[in-house]
Amino acid sequence: MMEFTIKRDYFITQLNDTLKAISPRTTLPILTGIKIDAKEHEVILTGSDSEISIEITIPKTVDGEDIVNISETGSVVLPGRFFVDIIKKLPGKDVKLSTNEQFQTLITSGHSEFNLSGLDPDQYPLLPQVSRDDAIQLSVKVLKNVIAQTNFAVSTSETRPVLTGVNWLIQENELICTATDSHRLAVRKLQLEDVSENKNVIIPGKALAELNKIMSDNEEDIDIFFASNQVLFKVGNVNFISRLLEGHYPDTTRLFPENYEIKLSIDNGEFYHAIDRASLLAREGGNNVIKLSTGDDVVELSSTSPEIGTVKEEVDANDVEGGSLKISFNSKYMMDALKAIDNDEVEVEFFGTMKPFILKPKGDDSVTQLILPIRTY
């Protein structure tokens, strides 16, 4: 038996976050449900697809406001999406849930009444246990940044599963996050304080994307704990657990060429918008290819679509070292890389027409984007 009354709006927000861990395609039918556990002083919501698990604790009061009133402790598993849709459409400000011994759950709000068939919570798989020792603490703002600057470059193809994740390497009080789909590479470096243990793990890109949606900007810090095959992110009232990917992440340091032939400094916004315009035709051509040529403090971008026509853009460079060069690249990769550099000025280093080139914020080595060119010349 379980019975509690809860503020509907607050409940919806927490349920929506819990749903992010639930997949309709699961081998265990019970995992399409949300586990609700009413304890003496809190209600705990759990969602999982066995890769990602989200556990949210709802306290009795938040900022001095009463949120939930628990009359009887107990637990039940309710069909996830149905249940959340019902709660969203209920008329009242409060919702009351009560269950019987068969886990039939009565949901009432205003003049509405729903009866749902619940499942036995004892059948719900136990969440992975992650020890709470040795936390790494980051600010939410920094972690959101790290995800935005690397996660877009993970591979979407399952042929090399390790590349669908971001490699987190912790050594000598530095965190190095690397993502690559073998056509481009994103690296973000970050100084940490007093980290005793070195780590080398691969966190699934999908998990980081979901975590990013849940972290609210008003939370300040997030604690990160690692187990042998799991990682736990603890932020506010949310525990977010993800399975780590197995396997060895390739050594990407050797991809970075040594001495550049040409280095230029350019306005990020102008460069981005010029590529964006040129890509209108590149996309029509079906291959997203844009040609770039450098010379005399000007960068020229061009693209051709046989059916539609041609485009030419010129962007002034602030600083050019070296001679002239022609190179072709995928416009989407370039725009993603520029978006990940939150600096007004970008440095681009070219090493030759068929060698990878590098983008980074001017005067800052903490973010590096590497892109492989396309052979057209």
Swiss-Prot record:
The record's listing under Pfam families reads: DNA_pol3_beta, DNA_pol3_beta_2, DNA_pol3_beta_3
Q: Which keywords does this Swiss-Prot/TrEMBL entry list? A: Cytoplasm, DNA replication, DNA-binding, DNA-directed DNA polymerase, Nucleotidyltransferase, Transferase
The record's SUPFAM superfamilies line, in alphabetical order, gives: DNA clamp
* Cellular location(s): Cytoplasm
Domain of life per record: Bacteria
User: Mind listing the GO biological process terms from this record?
Assistant: DNA strand elongation involved in DNA replication
GO molecular function ontology, one term from the record: DNA-directed DNA polymerase activity
Q: Name one GO cellular component term.
A: DNA polymerase III complex
Give the transmembrane ranges.
none
- Please name the SMART domains in this protein's record: POL3Bc
- Would you identify the family this protein belongs to, as annotated? Belongs to the beta sliding clamp family.
Purpose of the protein? Confers DNA tethering and processivity to DNA polymerases and other proteins. Acts as a clamp, forming a ring around DNA (a reaction catalyzed by the clamp-loading complex) which diffuses in an ATP-independent manner freely and bidirectionally along dsDNA. Initially characterized for its ability to contact the catalytic subunit of DNA polymerase III (Pol III), a complex, multichain enzyme responsible for most of the replicative synthesis in bacteria; Pol III exhibits 3'-5' exonuclease proofreading activity.
Tell me how this protein assembles.
Forms a ring-shaped head-to-tail homodimer around DNA which binds and tethers DNA polymerases and other proteins to the DNA. The DNA replisome complex has a single clamp-loading complex (3 tau and 1 each of delta, delta', psi and chi subunits) which binds 3 Pol III cores (1 core on the leading strand and 2 on the lagging strand) each with a beta sliding clamp dimer. Additional proteins in the replisome are other copies of gamma, psi and chi, Ssb, DNA helicase and RNA primase.
Spell out the protein name for this chain: Beta sliding clamp
Gene responsible for this protein? dnaN
